[in-house]
Amino acid sequence: MGRAIGIDLGTTNSCVAIMQGKDAKVIENKEGARTTPSIVAFTSSGERLIGAPAKRQATTNANNTFFATKRLIGRQYSDPEMKNLGVPYKVFAAKNGDAWVKTTDGKEYSPSQIGAFILQNLKEAAEAYLGEEVKDAVITVPAYFNDSQRQATKDAGKIAGLNVLRIINEPTAAALAYGLDKKHGHTIVVYDLGGGTFDVSVLEIGDGVFEVKATNGDTHLGGEDFDNAVVNYLLGEFKKSNGIDLKNDPMAMQRIKEAAEKAKVELSSAMETEVNLPFVTVDASGPKHLNIKLTRAKLESLVNDLIERTIIPCKKALEDAGLSASQIGEVVLVGGMTRMPKVIEKVKEFFGKDPHRGVNPDEVVAIGAAIQAGIIQGDVRDVLLLDVTPLSLGIETLGGVFTPLIERNTTIPTKKSQVFSTAEDNQTAVTIKVHQGERKLAIDNKLLGQFSLEGIPPAPRGVPQIEVTFDIDANGIAHVSAKDKATGKEQKIRIQSSGGLSEDEINRMVREAEEKAQEDEKRKKFIEVKNQADSLVHSTEKSLTEYGDKISPEDKSAIENAVNELKEVSKSDNIDDADSIQQKVTNLSQLSMKLGEAMYKESQQQQGGESSSTTNNEEEKVVDSDYQDMDNKEENK
């Protein structure tokens, strides 16, 4: 079995780690950073950029730069959360109703594909570090992700060429990293406020057992919302002073978003900062500049409602766990937003104690995922992890009522069976709608899918007995099977969700990802050979200027022609021309050896001349010198 990695696929940033002996190590990416921005961009030349390179060009390519797509994963376009996303790129309803994204040239991508590109990038970083292929991974998700979102994340792993060993909840992963070396039993709360989601989990830890007692959260609350609050404030202030609304200017919006995020981060350590964006727009009177001072107090007033929203899930989680805030031994802060002083203050106020800040909030989830990978592979022993399902799973019954079969905060994996029957005489089929959520009416909860039990022998209503079994696996993903108790016939049923990727779509995306990886490799080779060509042309032209008169006119003409041919072929932006450029590079390299010989010959002559000159100079400098016999000098004293 190969090495397995742990990946935190975040809304804003992602991170990869691996177990080395008894410790987990965060792996640096190609740029040498320990976290990678969860951003994918497509340039006008068709190049795909991931991470920091994608982030750097976002201002000039906002419509083709996809960030925060974790907020779209596993969601229907009609979901209320899809309104007012505040992103410059196009989000649309795919054929299955899911929210997908589209580039300006019409290429369509599912959020799972965008996630797969990021996972692929992290996989490559791990392979470069380990020097071997990586196939297995544990990937984290917000604890409050529903079945569709978990399945879509697992699909992303498959598209990236990974065998997903386990989908693990982010707070649980953080608890693993925090408590692996702690022997004494105590109860902790993991407060995880990240870039796009908020989770809170209550766990009991002791003697290698990590038991989640309750979890709650909000999958649409995080740093992105804090950024948007600052963006809206800056837009309002600019409109007040200049009378210009920048909302429809993608380039200005991208600059303001980046400045808002930067200001938010700075105000975690400073009391005041200045947002200064020269030439943010232009009108008939000339260019306009944005220059606004932002204090920590103002920022806190802008985001206070968002911080207060995190307390509601905290109350629910404690209530479900049957505990009070005073019974919590430690509160562990996870996620970049927990660096904000106001967030720390609010957590302290609610739980009545200073939160634990001894873990790196950006890396602890990936470290926990790596530990879970180690547990699965047998590298980490004597650790038992007992997680829970965050949402109730059930069906729609008469009158549209939601009837839960598996309650929220049930330890997983778990299984529950219930007997159903027919509502009419001689009914030969029953349609069962599977929902997930906490609302009383089925329509208010997430429809995971529906299936029909067919071929039921005709009988009076209420007589047939169909036992339907729901089970949730260790990934938190639901499965359904059905059995006709009269005939003993059993049928495994795959929930056909109204959304989600089909097996054919996943396979197509896997192929596309592999093809894209090959294309990326070709593009890399193309860029390298073009750089080699530019360097060779420059050095050859320089050598021709200095030593062109030292070689024969025929050789000089051949080299000049080869330089011009290489210049011409290097103008191409077609990556398929890499071999042609390479041939011209090889040809010029061989021809320019004549120049090298001339340079070497002249160098030898110069060295010979210098040697002769040095000898003559030394002979000219020989002079007779007076000397004193020191012994005689002593005697004469």
Swiss-Prot record:
UniProt keyword Disulfide bond present: no
Compositional bias per record (Low complexity), positions renumbered to this chain: 602-616
Biased composition (Basic and acidic residues): 618-637
Classification via NCBIfam families: PRK00290.1, PRK05183.1, prok_dnaK
Induction of expression: By stress conditions e.g. heat shock.
Function field: Acts as a chaperone.
HAMAP family: DnaK (MF_00332)
InterPro entries noted in UniProt: ATPase_NBD, Chaperone_DnaK, Heat_shock_70_CS, HSP70_C_sf, HSP70_peptide-bd_sf, Hsp_70_fam
Disulfide partners: none
Keyword Phosphoprotein: yes
Modification Phosphothreonine, positions: 197
Domain of life: Bacteria
Molecular function terms from GO: ATP binding; ATP-dependent protein folding chaperone; unfolded protein binding
Region Disordered: start-end pairs: 596-637
PANTHER family in the record: HEAT SHOCK PROTEIN 70KDA
Similarity section: Belongs to the heat shock protein 70 family.
Alphabetic keyword roster: ATP-binding, Chaperone, Nucleotide-binding, Phosphoprotein, Stress response
Protein name from the UniProt record: Chaperone protein DnaK
